[in-house]
Amino acid sequence: MFEQKISSEALTTTTSIPATGQITQRPLRDSVRQAVSGYVAQLNGQDPTELYELVLSEVEAPLLDIIMQYTRGNQTRAATMLGINRGTLRKKLKKYGMG
């Protein structure tokens, strides 16, 4: 169909596939952990509200953007890659001003 170029960094950080067939995401998890820890360290005793939603949106928006670019805007293919139905994808794209 078409040739997709993936950087070697992306391969080493996100696509190690063990015998189970599952993609190993430890480097991604470690990056998120480090970012959240840095954010919490800067709170200085304050308790923010909706931290869960903040973290999810900070990860979800770029994920959707990257997958939509990868699939060249094909929402059906993107939804399949993400493991969500197309209607849910459309809602999320609208939420982040991408659809």
Curated annotation (Swiss-Prot):
Family annotation (InterPro entries): Fis_DNA-bd, Homeodomain-like_sf, HTH_Fis, Trans_regulatory_Fis
The UniProt record lists the keyword DNA-binding: yes
Pfam families: HTH_8
Renumbered residue ranges of the record's region Disordered: 1-25
Alphabetized UniProt keyword annotations: Activator, DNA-binding, Transcription, Transcription regulation
An example molecular function term from Gene Ontology annotations: sequence-specific DNA binding
Chain residues forming the annotated DNA-binding region: 75-94
Function: Activates ribosomal RNA transcription. Plays a direct role in upstream activation of rRNA promoters.
HAMAP family: DNA_binding_Fis (MF_00166)
Subunit structure: Homodimer.
Recorded family membership: Belongs to the transcriptional regulatory Fis family.
The name this protein goes by in its record: DNA-binding protein Fis
Species of provenance: Psychromonas ingrahamii (strain DSM 17664 / CCUG 51855 / 37)
Taxonomic lineage of the native organism: Bacteria, Pseudomonadati, Pseudomonadota, Gammaproteobacteria, Alteromonadales
